């Protein structure tokens, strides 16, 4: 009995560290009582090592998943991998830029005002008005006042020339007397298409005087004087070879209108 109890067994012992590496191998003679303890210790150490390996594998799984893209790319699927990712990322900025562009266009785009369309006749009239010279537009807008037909004492010749279209221009002007040159007299003047400039009394009475043929005139001068110091400051000087006379107006528009009509008639008659 003593021989069996004292019988010793030899057992190989493997020592493994925390990292799962085998450090050393030793042979040790154990008693039967010690062998059971060694076996239980070995089982505990093996279980501990397996648990550490399992924890290490769990830690490595995320890293392997992150490297999976690279492995896939290395196998020739790089185009598909990167294109899928780049496509998803590139679409989002483009959509965002498009949305920003629409918002900015809505905010910044000015409101368009629609102008009403003109009729053909109105458009033609505006075209004709734009084609006219500035002086003609001005004179069409202003016409000096003329003697009314209700003036029964007026010479009928005035109204007959007007009705027959023989009158170029008519109206009131101031004329300076030859003898008493310091005095002005208001007269009613008429310029006919034949170029005859004549005048009547202010109310159109009496026979016409003057009767100057503007075709024989040599020059027409006109100027403006300070209205504070001079009566009838808008003046016209008409020159003939042997004489001249002075006319005057109270407003510049009437003076300019008469000067233009006189010059037009003279040019037409001298052609």
Curated annotation (Swiss-Prot):
Residues 42-64, 92-120, 128-140 have a biased composition (Basic and acidic residues). Disulfide bonds: none annotated. Residues 26-145 are annotated as: Disordered. SUPFAM superfamilies: PH domain-like (SSF50729). Coiled coil: none annotated. InterPro entries: PH-like_dom_sf, PH_domain. Signal peptide: none annotated. PROSITE patterns: PH_DOMAIN. CDD domains: PH. Residues 166-267 form the PH domain. This is PH domain-containing protein ECU06_0670.
């Amino acid at each position: 009995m003593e021989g069996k109890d004292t019988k010793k067994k030899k057992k190989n012992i493997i020592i493994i560290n925390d990292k799962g590496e085998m450090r050393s191998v030793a042979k040790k003679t154990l008693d039967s009582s010690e062998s059971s303890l060694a076996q239980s210790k070995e089982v505990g150490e093996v279980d501990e090592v397996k648990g550490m390996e399992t924890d290490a594998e769990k830690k490595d799984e995320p890293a392997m998943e992150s490297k999976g893209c690279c492995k896939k790319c290395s196998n020739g699927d790089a185009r598909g991998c990167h294109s899928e990712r780049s496509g998803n990322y590139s679409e989002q900025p483009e959509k965002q830029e498009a949305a920003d562009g629409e918002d900015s266009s809505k905010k910044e785009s000015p409101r368009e005002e629609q102008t009403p369309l003109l009729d053909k006749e109105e458009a033609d009239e505006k075209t004709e008005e734009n084609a006219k010279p500035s002086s003609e537009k001005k004179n069409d807008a202003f016409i000096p006042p003329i003697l009314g037909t209700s003036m029964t004492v007026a010479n009928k010749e005035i109204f007959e020339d007007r009705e027959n279209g023989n009158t170029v221009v008519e109206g009131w002007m101031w004329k300076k007397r030859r003898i008493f040159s310091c005095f002005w007299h208001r007269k009613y003047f008429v310029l006919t298409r034949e170029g005859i400039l004549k005048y009547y009394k202010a109310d159109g009475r009496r026979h016409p005087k003057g009767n100057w043929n503007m075709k024989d005139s040599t020059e027409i001068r006109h100027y403006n004087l300070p209205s504070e110091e001079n009566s009838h400051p808008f003046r016209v000087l008409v020159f003939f070879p042997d004489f001249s006379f002075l006319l005057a107006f109270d407003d510049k528009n009437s003076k300019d209108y008469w000067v233009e009509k006189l010059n037009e008639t003279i040019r037409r008659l001298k052609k």
